Curated annotation (Swiss-Prot):
Protein's cellular compartments: Cytoplasm
Pfam families per record: RecX_HTH1 (PF21982), RecX_HTH2 (PF02631)
Gene for this chain: recX
Annotated function: Modulates RecA activity.
Superkingdom: Bacteria
UniProt-recorded name of the protein: Regulatory protein RecX
CC per GO annotation: cytoplasm
Family: Belongs to the RecX family.
Gene3D superfamilies: Winged helix-like DNA-binding domain superfamily/Winged helix DNA-binding domain
Heme recorded as keyword: no
GO annotation, biological process: regulation of DNA repair
Keyword Cytoplasm recorded: yes
Length: 151
């Protein structure tokens, strides 16, 4: 391992971060796939930390914000997706504390409602399935459906 390798790996990592924010684990994986040694990767990650270019909490918050803007999702699904991105559980939980699951569930239900046909019970079942698939918990779904379908 040489300074040249470290410089190349750092430039590559900065390039990735220039495109979009990445988690620490994503950068580690990308550099590993590019053939850099573990020692070089750790040096690069330390350097990115000192430059404040790598922040898993910021990444998690931004990921949640952008993900739910496009497609409202529940806590279960977001937690799973953050885990897939390599965000540590404690950081994911901190980012998810700011998340309003009830509002997102209502938003997802309102988006789906115009496309549902049939009687109220049929619509309730379809909507329930849709919200479960989006990763919302049963209590939030129940409250949302009661609010929407009793009016």
């Amino acid at each position: 391992m040489s300074d040249s390798d470290t410089r190349k790996a750092l430039n590559r990592a900065i390039g990735y971060l220039g495109i979009r924010e990445h988690s620490r684990q994503e950068i580690r994986g990308k550099l590993k796939r590019n053939g850099f040694s573990d020692e070089t990767i750790e040096k690069v990650l330390e350097r990115l930390d000192t430059l404040n270019l790598l922040d898993d909490l910021s990444f998690a918050r931004n990921f949640i914000r952008s993900r739910t803007r496009v497609k409202p999702s529940g806590l279960y699904k977001l937690r799973y997706e953050l885990r897939q991105k390599g965000v540590p559980d404690d950081i994911a939980e901190e980012a998810l504390r700011e998340y309003d699951s009830a509002a997102q569930c209502l938003n997802a239900a309102l988006k789906k409602m115009p496309f549902l046909k049939g009687d109220q019970e049929h619509r309730r079942k379809k909507l329930h399935t849709h919200l479960v698939n989006r990763g919302f918990d049963s209590q939030t779904i129940r409250q949302t459906l009661d609010e929407l379908l009793t009016n």
